[in-house]
Design a protein with these regions (language model features):
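Extracytoplasmic substrate-binding proteins
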Residues: 59-133, 154
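Alpha-helical, coiled-coil/dimerization segments enriched in small aliphatic residues
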Residues: 12-17, 135-155
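Short beta-strand->loop
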Residues: 10, 49-52, 73-77, 127-141
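Short, hinge-like loop/turn segments at secondary-structure boundaries
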Residues: 25-28, 67, 90-92, 143
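A short, structured surface patch at a secondary-structure boundary
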Residues: 1-43, 47-54
């Protein structure tokens, strides 16, 4: 979406947690932890973007490859990782304008926000809640924790 192209299938959290504006033709693959690979193949994607950190995504690589579907795995833990992924995806779609708009322009805003941090280094507790648990998360290896660290928070 941010890199161009059309979404043909997505996990249910795309609607439930992320609130993405996906039209009725997008196939709901079910749980992010147990996506329905048959439904994904039936949606006939040209290209699948998957998480390198989700066991179910990694497990479906062979099946998708055998079906002739190209899969790219990403580990996005911070803004630099996001920019790298966006760069690759906009190169694939040929939409350099979207790399500028959704990458470099946003990077300027991020840098402006970092400059606004007052240096007080507040102590925070970052909790990630899911339907079955709540976990305290550190500042490394996840987008929100990295953002808090960039703003000078002690997590």
């Amino acid at each position: 979406m941010l890199a161009g192209g059309n979404v043909v299938a997505a996990a249910n959290d795309s609607w439930e947690s992320l609130g993405l504006d996906l039209d009725g033709s997008v196939v709901n693959l079910g749980s992010i932890l147990e996506p329905d690979v048959e439904q994904l193949i039936a949606a006939e994607p040209d290209f699948v973007i998957a998480s390198a950190n989700t066991d179910a995504d990694v497990a479906m690589e062979e099946t998708l490859t055998q079906a002739g579907i190209t899969v790219a795995y990403f580990d996005v833990a911070n803004f630099e990782d996001y920019l790298n992924m966006l760069s690759i995806c906009t190169q694939i779609t040929g939409r350099d304008d979207l790399y500028q708009k959704n990458g470099l322009d946003v990077q300027k805003e991020v840098e402006e926000m970092k400059q606004r941090a007052d240096g007080s280094n507040p102590t925070v507790l970052f909790l990630r809640a899911a339907s079955s648990n709540v976990k305290a998360k550190g500042s490394d290896g996840n987008v929100c924790g990295e953002m808090l660290a960039d703003l000078g928070c002690v997590n």
